[in-house]
């Protein structure tokens, strides 16, 4: 019958702009047609009525269920309501829009911890960092371990000797090089600008913050091709790969035992110092 609830679907289409009041949403009608992607034409400009090839299909939608109407129309219209104000390109979510806008702003927030090169996308930074895993020009004369930087080789050689003579008087942490101590010391003096919004912990550089933030997100972008195990940071990923190759480059000069990680060697060498202290006291 002709009740007031039985109205044509066109009377209940949501008006443009009703999807939210976010500042990056722009009325599609204000975007020049030449700058829209295919499928972005206004509904008001779409051909009315059925096409000659397709039969007319009646769809009954209740006025009390507008969400059902929205779900019904979604497959018919490729909605991309987020528009770049610089070039007019459209996107279906704010994340893709923000990533695109870095092309215009030149922003590159993702920095390589090895060489300092910056990238606009996290995925590009991760792909770049894998290159450094293959670049190891500095070889230790005491073992088969090679390093990407001369500073890393120098620090490694201190591990062979079991020495970390440079100690921070504020927290007690020790380092094999004075330059490493100087870098560390600045973390006590300078404010840490990178603050985690999840737990409030602060960091002095974006690389350390990125590694920490993955503990909250669960992101583990480094995957071992041998066993499929994943890691959140590149250093643990590299150490894990040595287990597949059987590499144990860290050698104890006191007993000749080898280790795959420098931290394990340092822990082991403390047992020798404890034995020596016991003999001297007896």
Curated annotation (Swiss-Prot):
SMART domains: ZnF_C2H2 (SM00355). The keyword Transcription regulation applies. A zinc finger (C2H2-type) spans 82-104, 110-132, 138-160, 166-188, 194-216, 222-244, 250-272. Gene3D superfamilies: Classic Zinc Finger (3.30.160.60). There is a cross-link at residue 80 (Glycyl lysine isopeptide (Lys-Gly) (interchain with G-Cter in SUMO2)). Residues 1-75 are annotated as: Disordered. It holds the Pfam family zf-H2C2_2. Its main location: nucleus. It comes from the Eukaryota. Keywords: DNA-binding, Isopeptide bond, Metal-binding, Nucleus, Phosphoprotein, Repeat, Transcription, Transcription regulation, Ubl conjugation, Zinc, Zinc-finger. One of its GO terms (molecular function) is RNA polymerase II cis-regulatory region sequence-specific DNA binding. This is Zinc finger protein 691. The gene is ZNF691.
């Amino acid at each position: 019958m002709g009740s007031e609830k039985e109205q044509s679907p066109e009377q209940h289409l949501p008006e443009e702009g009703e999807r939210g009041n976010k500042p990056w949403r722009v009325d599609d009608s204000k975007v020049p047609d030449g700058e829209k992607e295919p499928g972005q034409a206004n509904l008001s400009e779409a051909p009315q009525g059925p096409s000659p090839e397709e039969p007319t299909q009646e769809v009954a939608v209740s006025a009390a269920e507008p969400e059902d109407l929205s779900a019904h129309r979604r497959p018919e219209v490729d909605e991309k309501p987020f528009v770049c104000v610089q070039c007019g390109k459209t996107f279906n979510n704010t994340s893709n829009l923000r990533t695109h806008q870095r092309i215009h702003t030149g922003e590159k927030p993702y920095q390589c911890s090895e060489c300092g090169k910056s990238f606009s996308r996290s995925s590009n930074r991760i792909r770049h960092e894998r290159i450094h895993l293959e670049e190891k020009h500095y070889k230790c004369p005491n073992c088969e371990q090679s390093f990407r930087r001369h500073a890393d080789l120098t620090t490694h050689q201190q591990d062979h000797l079991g020495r970390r003579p440079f100690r921070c008087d504020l927290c007690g942490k020790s380092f094999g090089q004075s330059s490493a101590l100087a870098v560390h010391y600045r973390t006590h003096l300078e404010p840490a600008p990178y603050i985690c919004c999840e737990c409030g912990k602060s960091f002095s550089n974006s690389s350390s913050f990125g590694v920490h933030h993955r503990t909250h997100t669960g992101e583990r972008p480094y995957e071992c091709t041998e066993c499929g195990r994943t890691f959140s940071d590149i250093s643990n990923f590299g150490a894990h790969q040595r287990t597949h190759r059987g590499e144990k480059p860290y050698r104890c000069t006191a007993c000749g035992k080898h280790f795959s990680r420098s931290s394990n060697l340092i822990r082991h060498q403390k047992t020798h110092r404890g034995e020596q202290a016991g003999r001297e006291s007896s």
